[in-house]
Structures are given as structure tokens and as C-alpha cells.
Amino acid sequence: MAVTAVVTVAGCSHTIDGTAERASADTADPDRSFGYVDDRCGLLVDSTIQEILAADNVVRPYSGAVCQYVLSRKAGAAPNADPQPMLDVIFSWFEAGSLGRERELSQRRSAEITDIVIERHRAFLARRDVTGAACSATAAAGSGVISWWVQFRGATNAGKGDPCQDAKKLLSATLQSEL
């Protein structure tokens, strides 16, 4: 019995050569395009965005280097919950942009900045709750930067979720997507 276990363990071991790759701004293909193509923004179709954000409805009133979405979710169970919580979402790709410039702009607007790494890309979250709970997730990608911005309409986000987590999910999905 003991011999069988040793043979099984030995048969399952496997060594992989190479070294771990650190996160960096240039891990992505510099020629990769994240722009609007084939009815996709940030490489994602509308139904994927709807699924990621658990939305009941999605409308994309504008598409281009910047894509705008309006989404709605079912009302919460709380007695004072919005009848249909609304989210505003924007994807942007700045082909020749820089993460430093986007970070500086967010700081000038008094956003709360959190440095993160998403899918091995340097990134940051910028939280700024002015007209509703809002957050953007921005990463260095290709030759520039991509960003997903999510805002819950209204003064608070009680019961609506976390806009930073939603923005991170969208950014992660874009960085994972294949052309």
C-alpha cells in the first residue's frame, strides 16, 4: 500500500522551466487595439458587460474610442430602495496615453487613488463620489491606457454595490479578452 502511494506521488510531480513574469506596463502587445470594432467596446460585447455587472438592461448610446453605457438593475428589497438602480458606465482607450498622466488627472480631481495590478498590468482605481458612488479602473495596455468608469446614480450607493469592484471586473475582462 505504501509503495503504491509513493509511485503515485512520483508520477504526479512535474517541473516547469522558466521564471515568473512580473507585472509591467509593457506586458501587452503594443500593437493590440482596444478600440470599438465588430460592435465591441474594450473587446467586450454588450451582453458580457450586462452579465459582469448583473444588470437587467443595457443600452449603449455612444460607441467609438469612448463607449457609453446606461444599465439598470432590479430594485433591492429595502423599503426605500430605488425603483430601478441605474449605472452609468464608460469605456475609454487612449492609444498614446500614459498611466502617469491619467493618474495625475485623477489626483487633480481629488479622487482617492489605489494602486493595483490587474491581469499582470499596472493599474489604479480612482474613487470619486460627487454625484453618486463612482470609480474608474485604469491600466497601462498596449501602447496606451484603457479605463472603465462605473457610477451609481444618486447620492449614495447603499445596496447598489461597489463601483470600484465593478470597474475592476470590466477591466479584467478586457485584459483577458482575445481579439
Task: Annotate each language-model stretch with its function.
Residues 1-3:
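N-terminal export and membrane-targeting signals
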Residues 35-43, 61, 158-165:
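Soluble non-cytosolic domains of exported or imported proteins
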Residues 47-52, 73-81, 143-144, 171-175:
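Extracellular/mature segments of secreted proteins
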Residues 54-122:
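Short, solvent-exposed recognition patches
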Residues 7-11:
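C-terminal motif of bacterial Sec signal peptides marking the signal peptidase cleavage site
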Residues 22-45:
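Post-signal peptide N-terminal segment of mature Sec-exported envelope proteins
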Residues 107-179:
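A short, solvent-exposed beta-edge/loop patch
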Residues 13-16:
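Bacterial signal peptide processing site
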